[in-house]
């Protein structure tokens, strides 16, 4: 193989590695966003479980947020301690006793923790692959400079 052909092949391989690194970077960004969403959902489930635990306490005043941003908050003195509404998915809710709600929330927490673990594993593998490609590209760049 001629030197020119070898240089052409090397250039194509470098371009291929660069494309792979770019694709991995996008994939890593997507995984990080997905992980952040899952962790946010996990925290919301834990907060909901804590709220269910608070229902059983006597003589408590509750704050009910009118929206997600807290633009309006209602003080509530009386809450039915025997029933809660729990979101089942899509636009479905069920009225259940607090213990059933805790069971549903425990299951949801376990599912989200498993999803988080899987995403973190995939993220770790992707970052390792990206770093390996970046190292190769860095070495190639260093050899070009010599």
From Swiss-Prot:
<keyword id="KW-0143">Chaperone</keyword>
<dbReference type="Pfam" id="PF02996">
    <property type="entry name" value="Prefoldin"/>
</dbReference>
<dbReference type="InterPro" id="IPR004127">
    <property type="entry name" value="Prefoldin_subunit_alpha"/>
</dbReference>
<keyword id="KW-0963">Cytoplasm</keyword>
<dbReference type="GO" id="GO:0016272">
    <property type="term" value="C:prefoldin complex"/>
</dbReference>
<comment type="similarity">
    <text>Belongs to the prefoldin subunit alpha family.</text>
</comment>
<dbReference type="InterPro" id="IPR009053">
    <property type="entry name" value="Prefoldin"/>
</dbReference>
<comment type="subunit">
    <text>Heterohexamer of two alpha and four beta subunits.</text>
</comment>
<protein>
    <recommendedName>
        <fullName>Prefoldin subunit alpha</fullName>
    </recommendedName>
</protein>
<dbReference type="GO" id="GO:0051082">
    <property type="term" value="F:unfolded protein binding"/>
</dbReference>
<dbReference type="GO" id="GO:0006457">
    <property type="term" value="P:protein folding"/>
</dbReference>
<comment type="function">
    <text>Molecular chaperone capable of stabilizing a range of proteins. Seems to fulfill an ATP-independent, HSP70-like function in archaeal de novo protein folding.</text>
</comment>
<dbReference type="GO" id="GO:0005737">
    <property type="term" value="C:cytoplasm"/>
</dbReference>
<dbReference type="InterPro" id="IPR011599">
    <property type="entry name" value="PFD_alpha_archaea"/>
</dbReference>
